């Protein structure tokens, strides 16, 4: 480790920023889950994204001026927003139907997908130890989902697609992270995300809902209606919390090395389980607990293995 990195590396502070940021994300997700029971999901996400975009632009202009709005590589930045749209919209779609802890446990496969995509897309060398961790992790997901059995719920598999889309974002970050400011990336991503929500909602409102549509997808075809003042306040609070959590996780990776911070991202599963129990009365089943622990263990092993090989 170089002297400059050593001076910047503040592991305890980085871990604290990460853990509290993930708590913020978990609380925000519970707010979105609550709002989606009373309003169409796309309407909830549209309002939240508009507020987040406004906050990011305001902070960016205040700290850096108009130059923060100019991206050096607009196409990868827009692709990042498209992936975020599919990742987060599908995740919140699942949250509207399944417990927070169940969705989080499957979503924790994202680091496994990152390892897989690093080998396939970036042609990075992945050794037998990490391939083994990936295989064990996805086996744990199969145990959690129980496909082919009476316990299987199709909507429970949606976070797996969400994790795959989200895992592509770090791949793009590795390509553009050295040339783009974090706020620029956030602004472009949120703007693209918001634009796609508006476009999708417009198309859905022009096309009649198909008959016998899956109940989970049927929620996308609900007609929009105005928020009450208290719920608008809840949406604003969720947006502020999301923005703070985003800044927190960015700060965590800025002041501590990746291999120190990444394992603590799994604290989201703990927060999600606790919040799901306290606010929704959800108690995770044995399959979710065992499978979730296996996925977390495999993800942490991959990170520690990469650190040992001096890859991060």
At which residue positions do the language-model features occur?
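Hydrophobic/small/kink-forming positions within alpha-helical transmembrane segments
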Residues: 22-27, 57, 81, 85-89, ...
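Helix-helix packing/entry segments at the starts of transmembrane helices
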Residues: 47, 104-109, 177-192, 243-277
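C-terminal transmembrane-helix exit sites in multi-pass transporters
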Residues: 110-132, 270-289
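Hydrophobic transmembrane alpha-helices of multi-pass small-molecule transport proteins
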Residues: 129-146, 162, 287-306
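Hydrophobic/aromatic residues within transmembrane alpha-helices
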Residues: 35, 44, 94, 100, ...
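Transmembrane alpha-helical segments that form core, pore/gating elements
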Residues: 33, 42, 56, 151-211, ...
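Membrane-interface interhelical linkers
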Residues: 1-20, 53-79, 195-236, 243-255, ...
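C-terminal-most transmembrane helix of multi-pass membrane proteins
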Residues: 2, 267-312
């Amino acid at each position: 480790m170089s002297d400059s990195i050593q001076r910047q590396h503040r592991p305890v502070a980085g871990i604290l920023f990460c853990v509290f940021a993930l708590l913020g994300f978990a609380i925000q997700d519970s707010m979105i889950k609550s709002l989606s029971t009373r309003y169409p999901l796309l309407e909830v996400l549209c309002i939240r994204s508009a507020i987040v975009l406004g906050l990011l632009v305001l902070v960016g202009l205040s700290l850096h001026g108009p130059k923060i709005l100019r991206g050096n590589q607009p196409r990868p930045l827009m692709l990042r927003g498209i992936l975020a749209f599919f990742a987060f919209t599908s995740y919140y779609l699942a949250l509207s139907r399944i417990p927070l802890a169940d969705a989080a446990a499957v979503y924790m496969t994202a680091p496994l997908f990152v390892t897989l995509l690093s080998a396939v897309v970036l042609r990075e060398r992945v050794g037998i130890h990490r391939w083994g961790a990936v295989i064990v992790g996805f086996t744990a997901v199969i145990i959690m989902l129980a496909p082919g059995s009476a316990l299987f719920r199709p909507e429970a598999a949606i976070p797996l697609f969400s994790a795959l889309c989200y895992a592509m974002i770090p791949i793009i970050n590795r390509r553009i992270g050295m040339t783009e400011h974090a706020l620029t990336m956030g602004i472009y991503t949120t703007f693209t995300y918001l634009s796609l929500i508006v476009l999708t909602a417009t198309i859905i409102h022009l096309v009649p809902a198909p008959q016998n549509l899956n109940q989970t997808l049927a929620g996308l075809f609900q007609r929009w209606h105005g928020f009450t003042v208290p719920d608008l306040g809840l949406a604003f609070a969720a947006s502020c919390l999301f923005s703070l959590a985003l800044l927190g996780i960015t700060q965590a990776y800025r002041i501590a090395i990746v291999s120190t911070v990444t394992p603590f991202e799994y604290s989201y599963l703990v927060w999600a389980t606790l919040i799901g129990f306290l606010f929704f009365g959800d108690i995770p089943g044995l399959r979710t607990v065992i499978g979730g622990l296996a996925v977390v263990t495999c993800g942490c092993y991959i990170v520690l293995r990469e650190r040992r090989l001096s890859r991060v």
